[in-house]
Curated annotation (Swiss-Prot):
Protein name: Metal transporter cnnm-1
Cytoplasmic topological segments: 226-259, 306-315
PANTHER family listed in its UniProt record: METAL TRANSPORTER CNNM (PTHR12064), UNEXTENDED PROTEIN (PTHR12064:SF94)
Tissues expressed in: Highly expressed in the intestine and in neurons, but it is also expressed in a variety of tissues including the pharynx, hypodermis, rectum and in muscles.
KW Ribonucleoprotein (keyword) present: no
Annotated Low complexity bias: 743-755
Origin: domain of life: Eukaryota
Encoding gene (name): cnnm-1
Amino acid sequence: MSASCLRLLTLSLFILGQCNVTAAQNGVDDEVTTVTAILDSATTAAADNSTVPTQSASNNNTSQSSKIPTIFGMRVELPADDPFGYDKHGVCSVTPEEEFKVVIYGNHLDKIHQIIWTFTNNCSEPAYVIDALNHFKVHFNHKATFHLTLKLLPEMVHAYKMCVKPKVAPGSPPLGEIYPLDDISTWLTTERPPKEYFLPLPLQIACIGFLLCLSALFSGLTLGLMSLTPQELELVIKSGAIKEQKCAAKILPVRKKGNLLLCSLLLGNVIVNSAISILMGELTTGIYALIGSTMGIVIFGEILPQSICVKKGLEVGAHTISITQLFIFLTFPIAWPVSKLLDCLLGDEYQAYDRKRLMELIKMSITDNGQVSNELKIAVGAMEIADKVVKDVMTKIEDVFMLPDTTVLNAKTVMEIVKMGYTRIPVYQYGDKNNVTDMLFVKDLALLDPDDNFTVKTVCGYHKHPVKFVMNDTPLPNLLEAFKKGEGHLAMVKRLINTDDKHDPSYVLVGVVTLEDIVEEILQAEINDEFDIVSDNVNKVKIKKEQNRDATKYFGDHEAPQTMISMQLQMVALQWLVSNERGFRQEFLDTNVLERLIRSSARRVDVSALMAMGDDAINVPRLAKVYTKDELSDKYILILEGRIQVTIGASGMMFEAGPWHHFGGEIMAKLVDGAATLGRSMSIVGTSELSARRPDLMFKPDYSAVVKEDCTYLEISVSAYINAYKASLMQRERPLNDLSDVSHNSSAHNSNLSLVEKPGPITDPSAMLVPENVRKPSVVSMDSPKILVGLGQHPVAPVAEEEEMALLDQP
């Protein structure tokens, strides 16, 4: 072969790369890995191997010399799972007792007779002999392959060396002695070279463990921190435990930069995982490296840390916030531009919960937290009313107790009304229940004499309680706002039945709705008291308890309630009030009405039945407190029996007030001065509602009054006085013909009137018509005349004292 061809072949082999690992090509099996050994110099190889035998080329003719086989290089192909290397001298190392493939390159390889492997310098001492006839495969005269299996080299032996024995043509002289090739690239050894690592083995193992910890940290923080939204962290800071607040405060500044934090954590996680794979591949190869790195990263770097950070993300994030900030700083040049791009594309990550989502979130929390389930139900109820309308909570009209305006309020009728247990009763005209015109409050009947036979129309005409109407599709929040503004706490519900544009709209009453119905929807529970007949207006679930509404003791003429004061004491109290307070005289209150007011306003406090009271006013039982310093009050107090202790001034001076001492004269003065404003238009619903509307009729005492011993006294509230005043007006202004007509027709009318029409409940029952026998007590006792006059005490008239003594002397 020409020198140019030789150089071309040598250059081609050099391009393959000296001792590089490549896949087998040109028919070589895919499972093998190629090791290429190239001669250091093609020219040197040609010179060294141009003549394999020891005879000189001058002893042969030119034709014979050109046919001598020449070896340029050798390549060893091993299985992929069989690693190989080179020892410190550059000799290729193979695994002993395992077959491998050898590829040799050169010229005139078809002229090779045998290839001999020896571990000495003498080719006549072969260790292995490869016969070209049986084991040799030549490709185009410049490439040949064969398979070889080597035993472990003996000790003190360095390598197997190759000897090439050429073929001898017939008639040619025999070859002389052959020697091993001196090129170490054609040598083989079975000694395994020591494995080289990037770092010392112990340090590399420690680095892998450290990187696994970082991988676990980044993976856990990516899930743990990113699952904590800034809103949740702010919520924890404001309402969480002290430890949680501290953790959230550390995380929040970093978490607000969400995309920057995400990019830094992901970038750090990728870098660490890549480093783990590289270092793990240095420790082992093949399937073992794959399994080791995968198991380490997946189990210790992903599954375990993420499962922990899902539940403990707040604590883990707070304790590792320094490491997180460090990696944000290290990855800032790359992470910051990416995070800004994400901010522009995706926008802010703040997400506000709408009402429905928040409501469903609370509902899910109810089943998980039994301790606060009631509070959560109330919250859900308050949010759900926005989706409800009046017809969802109203009491149907067929279950409403109503009265015609012609009903005569005699004793029997009043007792039946009280037995029904309703405090606000719709009143209709002309026998048409759709024509509700007024509202009768049972409290308006408290001071009426049943023998006067007033009609419902007359009573309603004086009080004129407004009647509120709402549509059945009115949202509950709108109705609640109306109730909050003081527009009553009960409304009649109507429904539009005529939708024709050509005619005026017409309506029909379909029910009644009260503030209690809305409160029940908010509380998600029924509110029952002693006057409820059903516990659910919609489903009509009846209450099984038996009601006791005996009203005869309040309206009977022969038997007074046990808590009422004696007749003699009533007469003396009436005379004292008329003599000493202008507001109780005939020009304001009728005598019969005043008598009923005294009977209904009598209170008795039995101190022996109360708890032992200390000197501290805070420990005084509620029933024993009459007045509290600097607290608004609407009560006028007159002591009949017993004593009340009064504490006055900044020094806490205490005095005792005895019988016929009174308190609250300021209220009576205001009522007398404002009698003209207590007309028909004022609707007296109750003490609390009146106080909210007319604070000008209240006073603020600069003293405290407490009952310290058994005491009987009159407690007349502003609302009770105004009711008595209106009752007196009705008796004075009632036309005579109305009295005669009512007296003439009362028996017939009552026989035909059925007050109880199987009524269902109106959902706002209130207290009994007459106050309880034992109510809030009062207290005072004084010896200083100046103090008594200052508190409004008046001496009892001598005539009153004589009459009282005379009455007491009677059997």
